[in-house]
Protein backbone atom coordinates (compact mmCIF):
# COMPACT_ATOMS: atom_id res chain seq x y z
CA UNK A 1 0.00 0.00 0.00
CA UNK A 2 1.31 3.43 -1.00
CA UNK A 3 1.35 5.66 2.08
CA UNK A 4 2.34 9.19 3.06
CA UNK A 5 5.91 9.18 4.36
CA UNK A 6 6.61 12.88 4.91
CA UNK A 7 5.07 16.33 4.46
CA UNK A 8 6.65 19.75 4.67
CA UNK A 9 5.91 23.34 3.69
CA UNK A 10 8.01 26.30 2.65
CA UNK A 11 7.23 30.01 2.38
CA UNK A 12 7.74 31.02 -1.28
CA UNK A 13 6.62 33.96 -3.45
CA UNK A 14 3.64 34.47 -5.72
CA UNK A 15 3.38 36.58 -8.88
CA UNK A 16 2.53 39.74 -6.92
CA UNK A 17 5.57 39.40 -4.71
CA UNK A 18 3.54 38.19 -1.74
CA UNK A 19 4.40 35.11 0.30
CA UNK A 20 2.51 31.87 -0.28
CA UNK A 21 2.89 28.22 0.61
CA UNK A 22 4.71 25.50 -1.27
CA UNK A 23 3.72 22.14 0.18
CA UNK A 24 5.59 18.92 -0.57
CA UNK A 25 4.49 15.34 -0.01
CA UNK A 26 6.81 12.31 -0.02
CA UNK A 27 5.30 8.85 -0.39
CA UNK A 28 6.49 5.48 0.92
CA UNK A 29 8.13 4.68 -2.42
CA UNK A 30 10.05 8.01 -2.14
CA UNK A 31 7.98 9.71 -4.83
CA UNK A 32 7.96 13.44 -4.10
CA UNK A 33 5.73 16.18 -5.48
CA UNK A 34 5.05 19.79 -4.57
CA UNK A 35 2.33 22.36 -5.12
CA UNK A 36 2.17 26.15 -4.73
CA UNK A 37 -1.05 27.74 -3.47
CA UNK A 38 -2.47 30.83 -5.26
CA UNK A 39 -4.08 33.88 -3.65
CA UNK A 40 -6.81 36.31 -4.73
CA UNK A 41 -7.03 40.11 -4.68
CA UNK A 42 -10.81 40.45 -4.88
CA UNK A 43 -12.16 37.74 -2.60
CA UNK A 44 -15.63 36.59 -1.66
CA UNK A 45 -16.52 37.07 2.00
CA UNK A 46 -17.59 33.42 2.29
CA UNK A 47 -14.32 31.99 0.96
CA UNK A 48 -12.28 29.58 3.06
CA UNK A 49 -9.83 31.49 5.24
CA UNK A 50 -6.31 32.11 4.02
CA UNK A 51 -4.04 32.18 7.08
CA UNK A 52 -1.58 35.11 7.19
CA UNK A 53 0.85 35.96 10.00
CA UNK A 54 -0.25 39.59 10.46
CA UNK A 55 3.29 40.34 11.62
CA UNK A 56 3.87 43.86 10.28
CA UNK A 57 7.65 43.43 10.56
CA UNK A 58 7.61 40.75 7.81
CA UNK A 59 6.13 41.18 4.32
CA UNK A 60 3.81 43.93 5.65
CA UNK A 61 1.92 41.33 7.64
CA UNK A 62 1.38 38.93 4.73
CA UNK A 63 3.82 36.21 5.74
CA UNK A 64 2.61 32.60 5.89
CA UNK A 65 4.98 31.10 8.46
CA UNK A 66 2.08 30.14 10.75
CA UNK A 67 0.41 28.25 7.92
CA UNK A 68 3.70 26.55 7.05
CA UNK A 69 4.15 25.55 10.68
CA UNK A 70 0.66 24.03 10.68
CA UNK A 71 1.72 21.85 7.76
CA UNK A 72 5.05 20.94 9.31
CA UNK A 73 3.55 19.99 12.68
CA UNK A 74 -0.17 19.22 13.08
CA UNK A 75 -0.95 18.18 9.51
CA UNK A 76 2.23 16.16 9.08
CA UNK A 77 1.72 14.36 12.41
CA UNK A 78 -1.82 13.25 11.59
CA UNK A 79 -1.35 12.35 7.91
CA UNK A 80 1.84 10.28 7.94
CA UNK A 81 1.01 6.64 7.31
CA UNK A 82 -2.32 7.27 5.59
CA UNK A 83 -3.03 5.66 2.21
CA UNK A 84 -1.89 8.15 -0.41
CA UNK A 85 -4.27 7.33 -3.23
CA UNK A 86 -7.35 7.67 -1.03
CA UNK A 87 -7.59 11.42 -1.70
CA UNK A 88 -11.11 11.75 -0.30
CA UNK A 89 -10.18 10.12 3.01
CA UNK A 90 -7.06 12.27 3.46
CA UNK A 91 -8.96 15.43 2.56
CA UNK A 92 -11.70 14.54 5.05
CA UNK A 93 -9.01 14.04 7.71
CA UNK A 94 -7.69 17.52 6.93
CA UNK A 95 -11.19 18.92 7.30
CA UNK A 96 -11.70 17.18 10.64
CA UNK A 97 -8.29 18.30 11.89
CA UNK A 98 -9.20 21.92 11.33
CA UNK A 99 -12.65 21.61 12.87
CA UNK A 100 -14.13 24.80 11.40
CA UNK A 101 -16.31 25.30 8.30
CA UNK A 102 -13.80 27.69 6.69
CA UNK A 103 -10.40 26.36 7.79
CA UNK A 104 -9.95 29.19 10.28
CA UNK A 105 -7.56 27.13 12.41
CA UNK A 106 -5.09 25.54 10.00
CA UNK A 107 -5.66 27.91 7.07
CA UNK A 108 -7.12 26.98 3.70
CA UNK A 109 -3.74 27.77 2.14
CA UNK A 110 -2.05 25.15 4.34
CA UNK A 111 -4.72 22.54 3.69
CA UNK A 112 -4.98 23.10 -0.07
CA UNK A 113 -1.22 22.95 -0.55
CA UNK A 114 -1.10 19.50 1.02
CA UNK A 115 -4.20 18.32 -0.87
CA UNK A 116 -2.75 19.41 -4.22
CA UNK A 117 0.71 17.99 -3.52
CA UNK A 118 -0.80 14.66 -2.46
CA UNK A 119 -2.76 14.35 -5.71
CA UNK A 120 0.32 15.18 -7.73
CA UNK A 121 2.53 12.73 -5.80
CA UNK A 122 -0.02 9.91 -6.14
CA UNK A 123 -0.32 10.49 -9.88
CA UNK A 124 3.45 10.49 -10.22
CA UNK A 125 3.80 7.27 -8.21
CA UNK A 126 1.26 5.56 -10.46
CA UNK A 127 3.05 6.90 -13.55
CA UNK A 128 -0.06 8.78 -14.64
CA UNK A 129 -0.40 12.39 -15.78
CA UNK A 130 -2.30 14.42 -13.20
CA UNK A 131 -5.32 14.93 -15.47
CA UNK A 132 -5.64 11.15 -15.98
CA UNK A 133 -5.26 10.40 -12.27
CA UNK A 134 -7.95 12.92 -11.30
CA UNK A 135 -10.28 12.42 -14.24
CA UNK A 136 -9.87 8.83 -15.35
CA UNK A 137 -10.38 7.62 -18.92
CA UNK A 138 -12.95 10.32 -19.70
CA UNK A 139 -10.50 13.20 -19.31
CA UNK A 140 -10.37 14.18 -22.98
CA UNK A 141 -11.69 17.74 -23.37
CA UNK A 142 -9.49 20.81 -23.74
CA UNK A 143 -11.16 23.89 -22.25
CA UNK A 144 -12.02 27.11 -24.04
CA UNK A 145 -9.72 29.77 -22.57
CA UNK A 146 -11.19 33.01 -21.27
CA UNK A 147 -8.27 35.36 -21.83
CA UNK A 148 -8.22 38.52 -19.77
CA UNK A 149 -6.71 41.08 -22.15
CA UNK A 150 -7.83 44.32 -20.52
CA UNK A 151 -7.63 44.64 -16.73
CA UNK A 152 -9.53 47.05 -14.53
CA UNK A 153 -10.96 47.17 -11.03
CA UNK A 154 -8.75 45.79 -8.26
CA UNK A 155 -6.42 44.13 -10.81
CA UNK A 156 -5.11 47.42 -12.23
CA UNK A 157 -4.52 51.02 -11.27
CA UNK A 158 -6.78 52.68 -13.83
CA UNK A 159 -10.24 54.22 -14.23
CA UNK A 160 -12.03 51.11 -15.55
CA UNK A 161 -14.65 49.73 -13.14
CA UNK A 162 -15.04 46.25 -14.59
CA UNK A 163 -12.27 43.93 -13.45
CA UNK A 164 -11.74 41.82 -16.56
CA UNK A 165 -12.45 42.14 -20.28
CA UNK A 166 -11.93 38.76 -21.86
CA UNK A 167 -11.95 37.06 -25.24
CA UNK A 168 -13.21 33.52 -25.83
CA UNK A 169 -11.91 31.77 -28.99
CA UNK A 170 -14.92 29.57 -29.74
CA UNK A 171 -14.67 29.06 -33.50
CA UNK A 172 -11.57 26.86 -33.74
CA UNK A 173 -10.89 23.16 -34.13
CA UNK A 174 -8.07 22.84 -31.59
CA UNK A 175 -6.84 24.44 -28.40
CA UNK A 176 -3.55 25.28 -30.12
CA UNK A 177 -5.29 27.23 -32.89
CA UNK A 178 -7.58 28.96 -30.40
CA UNK A 179 -4.60 30.06 -28.32
CA UNK A 180 -2.70 31.25 -31.41
CA UNK A 181 -5.63 33.38 -32.54
CA UNK A 182 -6.04 34.84 -29.06
CA UNK A 183 -2.36 35.71 -28.88
CA UNK A 184 -2.57 37.48 -32.24
CA UNK A 185 -5.53 39.51 -30.97
CA UNK A 186 -3.57 40.37 -27.82
CA UNK A 187 -0.62 41.71 -29.82
CA UNK A 188 -2.91 43.53 -32.25
CA UNK A 189 -4.64 45.18 -29.29
CA UNK A 190 -1.27 46.38 -28.01
CA UNK A 191 -0.56 48.08 -31.33
CA UNK A 192 -4.01 49.70 -31.32
CA UNK A 193 -3.52 50.98 -27.78
CA UNK A 194 -0.06 52.30 -28.67
CA UNK A 195 -1.62 54.14 -31.61
CA UNK A 196 -4.09 55.83 -29.26
CA UNK A 197 -1.31 56.80 -26.84
CA UNK A 198 -2.84 54.49 -24.26
CA UNK A 199 -0.79 52.74 -21.61
CA UNK A 200 0.21 49.19 -22.43
CA UNK A 201 1.47 48.30 -18.99
CA UNK A 202 -0.08 45.06 -17.78
CA UNK A 203 -2.15 44.21 -14.73
CA UNK A 204 -1.85 41.28 -12.34
CA UNK A 205 -3.20 38.80 -14.89
CA UNK A 206 -1.25 39.95 -17.93
CA UNK A 207 -3.93 42.07 -19.56
CA UNK A 208 -3.33 45.67 -20.52
CA UNK A 209 -4.38 48.39 -18.09
CA UNK A 210 -5.17 51.47 -20.23
CA UNK A 211 -6.87 54.57 -18.84
CA UNK A 212 -10.11 54.50 -20.79
CA UNK A 213 -12.72 57.03 -19.76
CA UNK A 214 -15.60 54.55 -19.45
CA UNK A 215 -16.41 50.85 -19.39
CA UNK A 216 -17.51 50.61 -23.03
CA UNK A 217 -14.26 51.78 -24.63
CA UNK A 218 -12.45 48.51 -23.81
CA UNK A 219 -15.19 46.57 -25.63
CA UNK A 220 -14.72 48.79 -28.67
CA UNK A 221 -10.94 48.41 -28.60
CA UNK A 222 -11.07 44.63 -28.25
CA UNK A 223 -13.68 44.33 -31.01
CA UNK A 224 -11.43 46.35 -33.32
CA UNK A 225 -8.42 44.21 -32.41
CA UNK A 226 -10.28 40.98 -33.18
CA UNK A 227 -11.30 42.19 -36.63
CA UNK A 228 -7.95 43.79 -37.39
CA UNK A 229 -6.24 40.50 -36.50
CA UNK A 230 -8.37 38.87 -39.19
CA UNK A 231 -10.98 37.06 -37.10
CA UNK A 232 -14.78 37.18 -37.13
CA UNK A 233 -16.13 39.05 -34.13
CA UNK A 234 -18.67 36.94 -32.28
CA UNK A 235 -18.32 33.94 -34.56
CA UNK A 236 -14.69 32.96 -34.08
CA UNK A 237 -13.90 35.07 -31.03
CA UNK A 238 -16.52 36.29 -28.56
CA UNK A 239 -16.32 38.65 -25.57
CA UNK A 240 -16.76 38.05 -21.84
CA UNK A 241 -16.74 40.21 -18.71
CA UNK A 242 -15.86 39.78 -15.06
CA UNK A 243 -17.48 42.77 -13.40
CA UNK A 244 -16.50 41.82 -9.82
CA UNK A 245 -19.54 43.78 -8.65
CA UNK A 246 -18.91 43.11 -4.97
CA UNK A 247 -16.10 45.66 -5.28
CA UNK A 248 -18.53 48.29 -6.65
CA UNK A 249 -21.55 47.95 -4.36
CA UNK A 250 -22.57 49.90 -1.25
CA UNK A 251 -24.69 48.77 1.70
CA UNK A 252 -27.90 49.71 -0.14
CA UNK A 253 -27.05 47.58 -3.20
CA UNK A 254 -26.27 50.59 -5.33
CA UNK A 255 -23.40 50.08 -7.75
CA UNK A 256 -20.84 52.86 -8.15
CA UNK A 257 -19.37 53.07 -11.64
CA UNK A 258 -16.78 55.71 -10.84
CA UNK A 259 -15.25 55.65 -14.30
CA UNK A 260 -18.59 56.83 -15.69
CA UNK A 261 -19.75 58.86 -12.68
CA UNK A 262 -22.89 56.72 -12.35
CA UNK A 263 -24.69 55.11 -9.43
CA UNK A 264 -27.08 52.33 -10.51
CA UNK A 265 -29.40 50.05 -8.58
CA UNK A 266 -29.60 46.34 -9.43
CA UNK A 267 -32.31 46.69 -12.08
CA UNK A 268 -30.54 49.63 -13.71
CA UNK A 269 -27.26 47.71 -13.82
CA UNK A 270 -29.01 44.73 -15.40
CA UNK A 271 -30.53 47.08 -17.99
CA UNK A 272 -27.01 48.37 -18.68
CA UNK A 273 -25.78 44.80 -19.22
CA UNK A 274 -28.66 44.14 -21.60
CA UNK A 275 -27.62 47.16 -23.67
CA UNK A 276 -24.02 45.89 -23.80
CA UNK A 277 -25.09 42.35 -24.74
CA UNK A 278 -27.32 43.73 -27.51
CA UNK A 279 -24.47 45.79 -28.97
CA UNK A 280 -21.46 43.49 -28.48
CA UNK A 281 -21.04 39.69 -28.79
CA UNK A 282 -20.76 39.18 -25.03
CA UNK A 283 -21.39 35.52 -24.19
CA UNK A 284 -20.50 35.51 -20.48
CA UNK A 285 -20.75 37.87 -17.51
CA UNK A 286 -19.16 36.92 -14.19
CA UNK A 287 -20.21 38.39 -10.85
CA UNK A 288 -22.60 40.79 -12.54
CA UNK A 289 -24.07 41.64 -9.14
CA UNK A 290 -22.83 41.55 -5.55
CA UNK A 291 -22.45 38.26 -3.69
CA UNK A 292 -25.12 39.48 -1.22
CA UNK A 293 -27.57 40.85 -3.79
CA UNK A 294 -29.56 37.64 -4.27
CA UNK A 295 -32.70 39.48 -5.32
CA UNK A 296 -30.70 41.32 -7.95
CA UNK A 297 -29.15 38.03 -9.09
CA UNK A 298 -32.61 36.51 -9.49
CA UNK A 299 -33.59 39.43 -11.72
CA UNK A 300 -30.35 39.22 -13.72
CA UNK A 301 -30.84 35.48 -14.22
CA UNK A 302 -34.43 36.00 -15.35
CA UNK A 303 -33.46 38.75 -17.81
CA UNK A 304 -30.27 37.29 -19.32
CA UNK A 305 -29.93 33.70 -18.10
CA UNK A 306 -31.33 32.15 -21.29
CA UNK A 307 -29.21 34.37 -23.51
CA UNK A 308 -25.72 34.31 -22.03
CA UNK A 309 -23.60 32.56 -19.43
CA UNK A 310 -23.92 34.09 -15.95
CA UNK A 311 -21.02 33.01 -13.75
CA UNK A 312 -21.02 33.06 -9.96
CA UNK A 313 -17.60 33.55 -8.38
CA UNK A 314 -17.89 35.61 -5.18
CA UNK A 315 -21.54 34.51 -5.27
CA UNK A 316 -20.79 30.78 -4.84
CA UNK A 317 -17.09 30.68 -3.75
CA UNK A 318 -16.79 27.06 -5.02
CA UNK A 319 -19.01 26.02 -2.10
CA UNK A 320 -21.49 23.20 -2.76
CA UNK A 321 -23.98 24.30 -0.10
CA UNK A 322 -24.10 27.87 -1.42
CA UNK A 323 -24.37 26.58 -4.99
CA UNK A 324 -27.30 24.40 -3.90
CA UNK A 325 -29.06 27.53 -2.66
CA UNK A 326 -28.45 29.18 -6.04
CA UNK A 327 -29.79 26.14 -7.89
CA UNK A 328 -32.97 26.19 -5.80
CA UNK A 329 -33.48 29.90 -6.53
CA UNK A 330 -32.61 29.58 -10.26
CA UNK A 331 -29.71 31.99 -9.83
CA UNK A 332 -26.87 32.08 -12.41
CA UNK A 333 -26.14 29.20 -14.78
CA UNK A 334 -22.40 28.73 -14.30
CA UNK A 335 -19.88 28.61 -11.48
CA UNK A 336 -16.25 29.65 -11.26
CA UNK A 337 -14.08 26.93 -9.73
CA UNK A 338 -11.22 28.08 -7.49
CA UNK A 339 -9.89 25.31 -5.22
CA UNK A 340 -8.50 27.77 -2.68
CA UNK A 341 -11.99 29.17 -2.08
CA UNK A 342 -13.11 25.89 -0.54
CA UNK A 343 -9.97 24.18 0.80
CA UNK A 344 -9.33 20.72 -0.66
CA UNK A 345 -9.38 18.93 -3.99
CA UNK A 346 -12.17 16.61 -2.81
CA UNK A 347 -14.43 19.50 -1.78
CA UNK A 348 -13.76 21.13 -5.15
CA UNK A 349 -14.80 17.89 -6.87
CA UNK A 350 -18.00 17.77 -4.79
CA UNK A 351 -18.96 21.25 -5.99
CA UNK A 352 -18.21 20.41 -9.61
CA UNK A 353 -20.30 17.24 -9.48
CA UNK A 354 -23.25 19.20 -8.08
CA UNK A 355 -22.88 21.90 -10.74
CA UNK A 356 -22.74 19.41 -13.61
CA UNK A 357 -25.70 17.46 -12.26
CA UNK A 358 -27.78 20.63 -12.51
CA UNK A 359 -26.36 21.69 -15.91
CA UNK A 360 -24.33 24.59 -14.56
CA UNK A 361 -21.23 25.30 -16.63
CA UNK A 362 -17.92 25.00 -14.74
CA UNK A 363 -15.09 27.49 -15.33
CA UNK A 364 -11.75 26.44 -13.84
CA UNK A 365 -9.92 29.52 -12.60
CA UNK A 366 -6.59 30.88 -11.46
CA UNK A 367 -6.21 33.67 -8.90
CA UNK A 368 -4.60 37.07 -9.46
CA UNK A 369 -1.71 36.00 -7.21
CA UNK A 370 -0.36 32.95 -9.05
CA UNK A 371 2.86 30.99 -9.54
CA UNK A 372 4.49 28.65 -12.02
CA UNK A 373 2.28 25.83 -10.71
CA UNK A 374 0.05 24.50 -13.51
CA UNK A 375 -2.25 22.26 -11.42
CA UNK A 376 -5.46 23.91 -12.68
CA UNK A 377 -4.59 23.10 -16.31
CA UNK A 378 -4.64 19.38 -15.52
CA UNK A 379 -7.66 19.85 -13.26
CA UNK A 380 -9.65 21.53 -16.06
CA UNK A 381 -8.99 18.63 -18.44
CA UNK A 382 -9.58 16.03 -15.72
CA UNK A 383 -13.05 17.37 -15.11
CA UNK A 384 -13.90 18.22 -18.73
CA UNK A 385 -14.62 21.65 -17.32
CA UNK A 386 -15.11 23.22 -20.74
CA UNK A 387 -13.65 26.60 -19.80
CA UNK A 388 -10.56 27.95 -18.06
CA UNK A 389 -9.65 31.40 -16.84
CA UNK A 390 -5.93 31.81 -16.44
CA UNK A 391 -5.11 35.29 -17.63
CA UNK A 392 -3.61 36.71 -20.77
CA UNK A 393 -0.84 35.34 -22.96
CA UNK A 394 1.69 37.32 -20.97
CA UNK A 395 3.43 36.85 -17.60
CA UNK A 396 5.07 33.48 -17.10
CA UNK A 397 2.78 32.38 -14.27
CA UNK A 398 -0.14 32.59 -16.73
CA UNK A 399 1.77 31.08 -19.65
CA UNK A 400 2.68 28.07 -17.48
CA UNK A 401 -0.96 26.96 -17.58
CA UNK A 402 -1.32 27.50 -21.33
CA UNK A 403 1.90 25.63 -22.04
CA UNK A 404 0.71 22.75 -19.89
CA UNK A 405 -2.59 22.64 -21.82
CA UNK A 406 -0.66 22.56 -25.10
CA UNK A 407 1.36 19.67 -23.71
CA UNK A 408 -1.79 17.82 -22.64
CA UNK A 409 -3.39 18.37 -26.05
CA UNK A 410 -0.30 16.81 -27.65
CA UNK A 411 -0.41 13.84 -25.25
CA UNK A 412 -4.09 13.31 -26.07
CA UNK A 413 -3.27 13.45 -29.79
CA UNK A 414 -5.51 16.48 -30.10
CA UNK A 415 -8.15 15.52 -27.59
CA UNK A 416 -11.46 17.35 -27.98
CA UNK A 417 -11.55 21.13 -28.16
CA UNK A 418 -15.12 21.98 -27.24
CA UNK A 419 -15.12 25.38 -28.98
CA UNK A 420 -18.46 26.18 -30.63
CA UNK A 421 -20.16 23.29 -28.84
CA UNK A 422 -19.57 24.87 -25.43
CA UNK A 423 -22.82 26.75 -25.05
CA UNK A 424 -24.87 24.25 -27.04
CA UNK A 425 -24.52 21.90 -24.08
CA UNK A 426 -25.47 24.55 -21.54
From Swiss-Prot:
Pathway the protein contributes to? Carbohydrate degradation; glycolysis; pyruvate from D-glyceraldehyde 3-phosphate: step 4/5
**Enzyme type, top EC level:** lyase
One GO term (biological process) = glycolytic process
Q: Which residues form the active site?
A: 205 (proton donor), 338 (proton acceptor)
Example GO CC term: the record gives: extracellular region
Residue numbers binding Mg(2+): 242, 286, 313
EC code(s) of this entry: 4.2.1.11
Concerning Pfam families, the annotation shows:
Enolase_C (PF00113), Enolase_N (PF03952)
Localized where? Cytoplasm; Secreted; Cell surface
**UniProt cofactor(s):** Mg(2+)
| SMART domains membership | Enolase_C, Enolase_N
The answer to keyword Lipid metabolism applying to this record is: no
Gene3D superfamilies linked to this entry: Enolase-like C-terminal domain, Enolase-like, N-terminal domain
Q: According to its UniProt entry, what is the function of this protein? A: Catalyzes the reversible conversion of 2-phosphoglycerate (2-PG) into phosphoenolpyruvate (PEP). It is essential for the degradation of carbohydrates via glycolysis.
PANTHER family associated with the record: ENOLASE
Q: What family is this protein classified in?
A: Belongs to the enolase family.
Task: Kindly give the NCBIfam families that the UniProt entry links to this protein.
Answer: eno
What is the designated name of this protein?
A: Enolase
Q: Which gene encodes it?
A: eno
Amino acid sequence: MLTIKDIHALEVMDSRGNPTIQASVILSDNTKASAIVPSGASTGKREALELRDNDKTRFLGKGVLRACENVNSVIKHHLIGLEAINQAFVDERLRALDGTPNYANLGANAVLGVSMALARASAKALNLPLYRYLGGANALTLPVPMLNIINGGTHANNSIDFQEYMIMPLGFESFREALRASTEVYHTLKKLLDGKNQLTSVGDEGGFAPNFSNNVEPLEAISQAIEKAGYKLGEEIALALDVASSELVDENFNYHLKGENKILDSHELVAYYKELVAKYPIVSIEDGLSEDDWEGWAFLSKELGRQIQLVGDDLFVTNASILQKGIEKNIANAILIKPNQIGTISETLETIRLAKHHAYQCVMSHRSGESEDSFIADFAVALNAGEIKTGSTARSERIAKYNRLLEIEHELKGGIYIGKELFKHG
